Structures are given as C-alpha cells and as structure tokens.
C-alpha cells in the first residue's frame, strides 16, 4: 500500500515494545485523503494484530491513538501506534511512500 501523507517515525523502548508516530498537516481539500490513509493503516494493524487492541498497561497487545486538530486553514492529523516491536516493523514494511 502506498502512503502519500503519513510518514512514520519509530521508537523502541528497549523492551521489545515500540511506537510509530506519523503527523500530517493539510488544508481541508486534502483531509479526506489523509483520513483514508489513517484508516488503511488501522485496518492493516487490526488485520495483522498480535492480540487484542487496548492500552498495553491494561492487557492490550497493541493500541492506536488518532488526534485531529484544526488551526485556521490547516488540519493536523496525528496517528500513533504502540505494540510489539516485530509486529510494528512488519506492519510498516507493508506501506511504501509515494515518490
């Protein structure tokens, strides 16, 4: 799958848990495309999940947080995934960046 807006940065906590965060700031005309990319990532994450979704400290195997904030003509969408490092890295390999 090709992503045009979301570029993920990964961080590892050293205990085999990682987080992957992407942020896109767009004008209203591009917001539907960004939200569609977010949905693609969430669908893939759920389809290939390592277990139940939920807060890791409450027994979940993975989780996601989506934030949308509008400031004037711009809307910023942030997506953060957390879960096992191997799962997240394999998930990220499913996506390619548009050139």
Task: State what each model feature region is.
Residues 13, 28, 70, 93-96:
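Amphipathic alpha-helical interaction segments
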Residues 1-51, 58:
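Long, contiguous N-terminal structural blocks used for assembly/anchoring
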Residues 4-7, 81, 94:
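Intrinsic disorder/low-structure terminal segments
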Residues 84, 88-99:
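Mixed-charge, glycine-accented linear interaction segment located at domain edges/termini
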Residues 3-4, 66-74, 96-99:
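A structural signal for the main folded, soluble domain(s) of proteins
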Residues 36-86:
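Amphipathic protein-protein interaction modules
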């Amino acid at each position: 799958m090709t992503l045009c807006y979301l570029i993920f940065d990964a961080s590892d906590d050293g205990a085999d848990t990682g987080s992957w965060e992407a942020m896109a700031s767009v004008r209203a005309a591009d917001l539907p495309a960004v939200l569609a990319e977010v949905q693609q990532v969430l669908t893939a994450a759920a389809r290939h999940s390592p277990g139940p979704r939920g807060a890791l400290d409450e027994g979940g195997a993975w989780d996601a947080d989506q934030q949308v904030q509008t400031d004037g003509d711009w809307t910023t969408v942030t997506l953060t995934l957390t879960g096992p490092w191997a799962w997240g890295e394999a998930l990220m390999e499913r996506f390619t960046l548009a050139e």
